[in-house]
Amino acid sequence: MGKKNTKGGKKGRRGKNDSDGPKRELIYKEEGQEYAQITKMLGNGRVEASCFDGNKRMAHIRGKLRKKVWMGQGDIILVSLRDFQDDQCDVVHKYNLDEARTLKNQGELPENAKINETDNFGFESDEDVNFEFGNADEDDEEGEDEELDIDDI
C-alpha cells in the first residue's frame, strides 16, 4: 500500500482544491426557471434572491444542494419558479465564477449583472465611490516651500 502525501483523514483531503477534472456542462434556464443573484443569506436553508426578471424572491435551497454546495452573497444561481407562489422559488443550481462569466458573455445574463469575484459584505450599491485627491489649499503652493510644524496642524 502506498502512502498518501496528505495528513489526516477525510477532512485533510477536503481542503485540497483539485480542479483537474473535466469542466461540467453549462446548465441553461428552461421554461419555469430564472437566473438570480443572492442578495442576503437568511439561514434555515433560505436565501433572498434578486431574479433577473426584476422580482425579489425568497429562495429555498433544495436538499440535494444543502450542505454540499455552499452559497454566499453575490453568487449567481438558477431558480425554479413556483406556479402557486410568485414570491418564492427553489434553488436548482449554483454557477461558479467561470460559468457566470460565460453566461454573461453569451447574453443569458443582463449586462448590468455584477459578477462578484469578492464578497461585497452586504454593501449593495450601484454607484461607485469616487475620491478626489486634488489640491485643497492651492494658495499654499504658490512659491512657499517651507516645512510643516506640528503646531501648525
From Swiss-Prot:
Residues 1-26, 133-153 are annotated as: Disordered. GO terms for biological process: formation of cytoplasmic translation initiation complex; formation of translation initiation ternary complex; formation of translation preinitiation complex; translation reinitiation; translational initiation. PROSITE patterns: IF1A, S1_IF1_TYPE. One of its GO terms (molecular function) is translation initiation factor activity. Residues 15-26 have a biased composition (Basic and acidic residues). Residues 22-96 form the S1-like domain. Keywords: Initiation factor, Protein biosynthesis. One of its GO terms (cellular component) is cytoplasmic stress granule. The keyword Protein biosynthesis applies. Signal peptide: none annotated. Residues 1-14 have a biased composition (Basic residues). Gene3D superfamilies: Nucleic acid-binding proteins. Present with 35100 molecules/cell in log phase SD medium. Seems to be required for maximal rate of protein biosynthesis. Enhances ribosome dissociation into subunits and stabilizes the binding of the initiator Met-tRNA(I) to 40 S ribosomal subunits. HAMAP family: aIF_1A (MF_00216). Belongs to the eIF-1A family. This is Eukaryotic translation initiation factor 1A. The gene is TIF11.
